Structures are given as structure tokens and as C-alpha cells.
């Protein structure tokens, strides 16, 4: 993913709600399943890591992204953004490389 595409996705993520919350249980199979379902439906999701989580925000985002075959777009504070293109019907069209 290019920096231009990443910047485009960050702009789209500004208006998203946090639909994924990771708490003291850390990254579990249920959290990964929720992320997978949300990415299939939306392609771009925003999540929050609560202060009680045992891992860092970057670690949580990378772990979830690896388990659901997504990309980490951004990590700011306790919030992270993940993107995975829908295989059949993409809703988000990324800008091309020039």
C-alpha cells in the first residue's frame, strides 16, 4: 500500500465509529472473528484498545491484522484503523500509483 493510498484511507476513517474494543482479555479468537466479520461488511474499521489491555496498541493492531489478513492503516493513541479489500465487491476504490 502506498503512502497516498494510506492517506486516503486515513481521511475516510476520520468519520468512523470505534466498532472494535480490546480490553483486559487482550486479543482473543472472538475479537478476531468480530474484526473479520466487520472487515467483510465494511472494508475499513476503527478499533480502540482500552487502558486495561495487556498489550500495546501497535501490537494489538498488528496481531489482529495478521489474523484476518488485513493491513494496519494507522495507530494514534489508543485507536487503530484496519483495511481489507473485499474480494468480490470492493466498496472503497483506492487511488492508483502514478
Predicted features, each with a name:
Residues 1-98:
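Positively charged, polar, low-complexity stretches
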Amino acid at each position: 500500500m502506498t503512502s497516498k493510498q494510506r492517506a486516503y484511507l486515513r481521511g475516510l476513517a476520520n468519520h468512523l465509529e470505534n466498532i472494535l474494543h480490546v480490553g483486559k482479555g487482550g486479543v482473543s479468537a472472538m475479537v478476531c472473528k468480530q474484526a473479520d466479520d466487520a472487515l467483510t461488511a465494511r472494508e475499513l474499521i476503527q478499533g480502540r484498545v482500552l487502558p486495561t489491555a495487556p498489550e500495546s496498541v501497535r501490537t494489538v493492531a498488528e496481531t489482529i491484522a495478521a489474523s484476518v489478513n488485513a493491513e494496519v492503516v494507522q495507530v494514534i493513541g489508543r485507536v487503530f484503523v484496519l483495511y481489507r479489500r473485499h474480494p468480490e465487491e470492493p466498496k472503497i476504490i483506492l487511488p492508483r500509483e502514478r
